[in-house]
Amino acid sequence: MAGRWNLEGCTALVTGGSRGIGYGIVEELANLGASVYTCSRNQKELDECLTQWRSKGFNVEASVCDLSSRSEREEFMKTVSNHFHGKLNILVNNAGIVIYKEAKDYTMEDYSHIMSINFEAAYHLSVLAHPFLKASERGNVVFISSISGASALPYEAVYGATKGAMDQLTRCLAFEWAKDNIRVNGVGPGVIATSMVEMTIQDPEQKENLDKLIDRCALRRMGEPKELAAVVAFLCFPAASYVTGQIIYVDGGFMANGGF
C-alpha cells in the first residue's frame, strides 16, 4: 500500500480522462503509482490516450460511457468494480460540460443536460462507488468544482449552480462518510489551459471575459492541467489524512482577489 507521499498499490477512477484536466489527473495519479480507470464518450480518443499512457508505462484502462445516462453509469461502475475486484481507493468526479448563455436563454434541454452531467452524474457515481470505497478501508472522493461555484461569472449561471451544488455535496458527504474512512474534498479550478478554453476564446466576447478573469488573478496567467492535478494527488495521499470537507481553489489567486 502507498507511503505517505505516493499512491503505490492504490486504485483510482477518473471520469472524463481523455482530455484537458481529466487527462492531466490520470497521468498524475498513474505516475505516482496508482492503477487508473477512466472513461469518455469517444472510443477513438480513449484508444489514442491508452496508447500514449501505455508507452509511458502507466497502468491505465478505459471504456466508453455516456455519463448523462443513468443506466450507463450503473453498468460502467460494475465494470470498474470488476476490474478492481470490488475495492476503489480514489474517485475523481471530473467530467463536466459548460454552456455559455445568459440564464434567460437556457432551454430546459440545456438545463437538464448540464445538470445531468455536472451534478447528477457526480452524485450518482459517488453513491455507486461508496461500497467499493468503503471496502478499500481508505477511500477518497475528489470533486472537480470551479470558481464559478462561489463567484458569479458572466454566462455561467447554470454551470455555476451545478458547481455550487457540488461544493455543498462535498461538505455533506465528508460528514456522512467519515465513519466509513472515506474522505471527500473538492478542487476548484480557475482558468486552466485546455482545449475547451481554446474553443471558447474563438468568440471575441468570450475571449474578452476570459481576459478579465485572468487580469483578476494574482499570477496573471492561465493554469496548466498538471498544476491542478498535483493538488488532486495531494488530497489522495495518506499524508492528507486529516483533510476532508474542503474546497481548494487552484486559480492563480482569483478567489483571494474577491472574485469577478
Curated annotation (Swiss-Prot):
Substrate binds at S146. One of its GO terms (molecular function) is tropinone reductase activity. It is an enzyme of class 1 (oxidoreductase). One of its GO terms (biological process) is tropane alkaloid biosynthetic process. CDD domains: TR_SDR_c (cd05329). Pathway: Alkaloid biosynthesis; tropane alkaloid biosynthesis. The active site is at Y159 (proton acceptor). Keywords: NADP, Oxidoreductase. NADP(+) binds at residues 13-37. It holds the Pfam family adh_short_C2. Its EC number is 1.1.1.236. Gene3D superfamilies: NAD(P)-binding Rossmann-like Domain (3.40.50.720). It catalyses: pseudotropine + NADP(+) = tropinone + NADPH + H(+). Catalyzes the stereospecific reduction of tropinone to pseudotropine. Belongs to the short-chain dehydrogenases/reductases (SDR) family. PANTHER family: TROPINONE REDUCTASE, TROPINONE REDUCTASE II. This is Tropinone reductase 2.
